Amino acid sequence: MTPDRTLALCDTTLRDGEQTAGVAFSLAEKKAIARALDRAGVAEIEVGIAAMGWAEVAEIRAVVAEIAHATPVVWCRLRMHDLDMAQKTGVKRVHFAVPTSTAQLEGKLRVDRDWILRETAALVFCASDRGLQVSVGAEDASRTDPDFLIRLAEVAAAAGAIRFRIADTLGLLDPLGAFRLVAELSARISLPIEMHAHNDFGMATANTIMAAHAGATHLSVTVNGLGERAGNAACEEVGAALEAGGIDTGLDLCALPELSAVVAKASGRAFRAQKPITGDDWLFAHESGIHVDAILKRADTYEDPRCAPARFGRERQIVIGKHSGSAGLRAALLEAGLPADDAVLDRLKPLLRAHAVRVKRPVEAGDLRRMVARLARPSPRT
């Protein structure tokens, strides 16, 4: 993949993200998420599943009204009813999820491959004939014979599909496997390829990046990696990593913290403190004496500009703790208006380290004042 290439992020927080066990968005929350996604610059937003009923159709219409720039997409099963309901939303892009693995065909649908090919051709042609843009996704593609995936893509293309999605539905691929699968299909089918990765082994983001290197032009993501089981590829991680490599995704990186917070609140799923890009206030904090001494002299010693806090609208923090050295501790003391000579530093460090072990957090200015005051008290006579 060459630098300066453009890739499209297709966010499915409102569809696959909401399929997370126990997650259910209100209409107000859906609108807020849609607005935040649109401000952040994602190319496409899967806005829901119209086949859930008329209430969902009404909500999709309301959500779409909040989207100014991104392309809304309605997700469909391979059923005429789903297409009919999707059309009621007024959305002009639909996606058909097509089961492809033996387990899916035999265990879920009780059909064979020929039936899948016929239904795909018929429904894609029907949707295209109605003036809709259609993408087709191979569900459970990572457990499907690549030759059948190619046949399905050819059938979909002939019927009018504009894109083919590879779904690693159970999150079984590793980065090398993702690269090989996408590279093979990219070389053998005419449709642009979208990668949809799940995170069951913690590799969804890496698999998505490797799919981009292998030729995928569209990448399916969710905010905070929200999604079924272990989740999906995280929008903020995929976007930031690609942008760091010179790949344009259209994302406003400074909008990612707000987007992440909106989804975390609506989903009730807090992300871990050290989550890349959008973690808590300590994410861009430095404590280690070696690091702090260097970064105070020159920021890029331990902060590459491609992942510097300002790139994401964040701020660097120098915190004091067990591993602080003289440079960081002296800076903190001076900032707090406290004495910072070598004698104070030498006496303060043992107190500071014991305090850090006890409280399990960075040492704050108030803590430093109390410790310095303790040092100033006369020692009891023996």
From Swiss-Prot:
One of its GO terms (biological process) is nitrogen fixation. This protein is a Fe-Mo-cofactor biosynthetic component. PROSITE patterns: AIPM_HOMOCIT_SYNTH_1, AIPM_HOMOCIT_SYNTH_2, PYR_CT. Keywords: Nitrogen fixation, Transferase. It holds the Pfam family HCS_D2. Residues 7-257 form the Pyruvate carboxyltransferase domain. NCBIfam families: nifV_homocitr. Its EC number is 2.3.3.14. It is an enzyme of class 2 (transferase). This is Homocitrate synthase. InterPro entries: AIPM/Hcit_synth_CS, Aldolase_TIM, LeuA/HCS_post-cat, NifV/FrbC, PYR_CT. CDD domains: DRE_TIM_NifV. The lineage of its organism: Bacteria, Pseudomonadati, Pseudomonadota, Alphaproteobacteria, Rhodobacterales. It catalyses: acetyl-CoA + 2-oxoglutarate + H2O = (2R)-homocitrate + CoA + H(+).
